Amino acid sequence: MSDIYYQLPVEIWLQIIFFSDNINLLFVDKNFFGLIKLINDKKPIIKKIINQNYFDVLRYAIKNCIGIFGDNFMEDCLRQSFYDGQLYIADYLVDKGADIYSMGNLYFITTNETENHNNFRYVDGLNVLQGKFNKKTGFYVHKPETICQYLNHNIYLRDVYLPKGKTGFKKFKLENYYVANMIVLGKQRNLIDLDTWKYMIYHGTIITEGVIEYCRINKCTKIVDYLLDCLIETNHNIDIYTACKNGYTKLAIHYIKNSIICREIRYYIMSRGTYWTDNKSENINHEHIANLATQNGHIEILKYLVEEKYELVGNLYIIMFLACQYGHLEIIKYLVELGVDIRQGLDAFIYLLWQGSYFNILKYLLTVDSDIINIINKVDYNGWFKMYLKDPLSIDSNHYIHPYTISELKCRINSPICKPIYYLRNKSIGTIDFDDFNDIDGFND
């Protein structure tokens, strides 16, 4: 081919290419490829290189002929590679210095396992809606910061760009997302991969309570730990009360340890599709968060509160009451180890456990004080507890008889006959009044 090339003038070769409408001839020889500099409109050549996956030609052009194609050659190739779904070429171009921001704003969508939405099967690259387009039938794309509002049960994250230069492109803006009739799908990432979340956080995704619960449901422990670390480093809309309620131990302990009283909350407004920030300065209510941790069975948070903020967590009998009400055996064991009397309040704890059908806890308390069997026998009219001790699986909890209401039992704990007890500095419990803590020797040292 080289011999033939030199036998004919360049102008004739150009005429052959144009009249045959076959630009493939440009790619058969380096000499022919050099003719590109004589062609004014180079877009069809770029399109051909990308569409036909002429990867070696692309690499050669980047290395030796980039000036021939103009200043935006890399970005033109990048755009074409995204449109054609040649995503590995797009990655290569970005690695070589192509400006990814030339694609416009980055958006996200999440997809299911089949990547099918409203009977439309997504493909890499350009996706064009067929048929009537309106606000309900188009492709929904989201800003990175709000994508976590739309995780649902999806398993993949997709990069999305809007092909604004395409003929016929249309879009609507609704709340905080767009609806378009054309989108360009980039790389697919799995939502159970840690690197996916690092990528999302890098692009500004806001961590919400729903995000952490999504990762918990999918048993993504490393991702949960990473997200909590991110929350410790930056302020988001998960405060200490939510952390204690949901058992975000690392985050809750961070708040407690550092006595964070100024929390920055980013509020999300669905109707406007916006966030705004509100700095709230307030004293942490340690008694309240101790109760939240107890109600929801988060023993590590409670332990840290009791042992590090002992002067603030309040009456341990109230905490024991909540542990019995919600049936958290490990917390009850912990409180018993501290020295909490299980017979206080006219045996309110025993009755409360009976009412909640927590026979497993009553069985444990028998090892602490065998005399409570007399209380149990008084309410065990049909011998349900005896049956449980013989065969726990034989009991139907719907048959229990509850002699007292929770309100009645709570009154016993709050009555003068049950003097409040608190965890003291010397790792013990005592019955001093809460207001007397400032008088404890060495308390303010």
UniProtKB/Swiss-Prot annotation:
ANK repeats lie at residues 73-102, 285-314, 315-344, 346-375. Gene3D superfamilies: Ankyrin repeat-containing domain (1.25.40.20). SUPFAM superfamilies: Ankyrin repeat. Keywords: ANK repeat, Repeat. It comes from the Viruses. Transmembrane segments: none annotated. Pfam families: Ank_2. This is Putative ankyrin repeat protein L797. It comes from Acanthamoeba polyphaga mimivirus.
